[in-house]
From Swiss-Prot:
One of its GO terms (biological process) is D-glucarate catabolic process. InterPro entries: Aldolase_TIM, DapA-like, Dehydro-deoxyglucarate_dehyd. The keyword Lyase applies. Gene3D superfamilies: Aldolase class I. Pfam families: DHDPS. SMART domains: DHDPS. SUPFAM superfamilies: Aldolase. This is Probable 5-dehydro-4-deoxyglucarate dehydratase. CDD domains: KDGDH. It comes from Cereibacter sphaeroides (strain KD131 / KCTC 12085) (Rhodobacter sphaeroides). Its EC number is 4.2.1.41. It catalyses: 5-dehydro-4-deoxy-D-glucarate + H(+) = 2,5-dioxopentanoate + CO2 + H2O. Keywords: Lyase. Pathway: Carbohydrate acid metabolism; D-glucarate degradation; 2,5-dioxopentanoate from D-glucarate: step 2/2.
Amino acid sequence: MDPQQIKAALGSGLLSFPVTPFDAENRFAAAPYQKHVEWLSGFDAPVLFAAGGTGEFFSLTPDEIPAIVRAAKESAGKTAIVSGCGYGTEIARGIARSVEAAGGDGILLLPHYLIDAPQEGLYAHVRAVCQATGMGVMVYNRDNAVLQADTLARLCDDCPNLVGFKDGTGDIGLVRQITAKMGDRLTYLGGMPTAELFAEAYLGASFTTYSSAVFNFVPALANKFYAALRAGDRATCESILNSFFYPFMELRSRRKGYAVAAVKAGVRLVGFDAGPVRAPLSDLTGEEEKILEALIDAHRE
């Protein structure tokens, strides 16, 4: 896809990011990954994010990422595949090139590694990555990589292939400033952990979609919530929030890293061989998996 095509795809429906399965030797397990991606692509997600945050990008080596992208492309049918990308500038540029060579449709630029940086440094980083690829690029505003509206506007002027903005800050004032300033120059995605909890607020700030983690294991329920959100059906949204998302949030909040580990547990519980999370994350306890299993069983469709 060219940058404008991936921009349109990103804004055309509910998105998700498959977990990355590992085998007993802690290696990427391509076969179960492809089985899961093929299943997810049947639930009308226009884009799936391979090797994203929930796909444990932070635990992958740069060499593993193009293999994951190739596996996703082979099994996703018509669903576009956007890859995670990040770390320091030169590593990120290399990942962008390798993803493009592997057939990826775009990249999601996650925060750089560890240090804080001034706006000029963030500008230089994003610009350098955009210049390394012909694919569409989406920036992920969160943690130590928060672009301000003026910086983002400069990047949009200088980088034609910068087509998307994903927010993980929860700063509605900033994101509304960005959407007011940039208008339809970008596609906007909500990116808070368990994005459904914030979806109504982000919709009011002109974010029409988001990436759903729970789509990994309850895609029909995720689609039902998204359809209700877009239809203005507040009663259905509140019903699903109360019956599923708030209990899931309580479980997810028990330990740091469970925003990923709980999703991977959910994927295992619905029958896919996702394997464990990689260190430094920890898997749910047996008791916690039983709680999650009961929650899933109550919402099977």
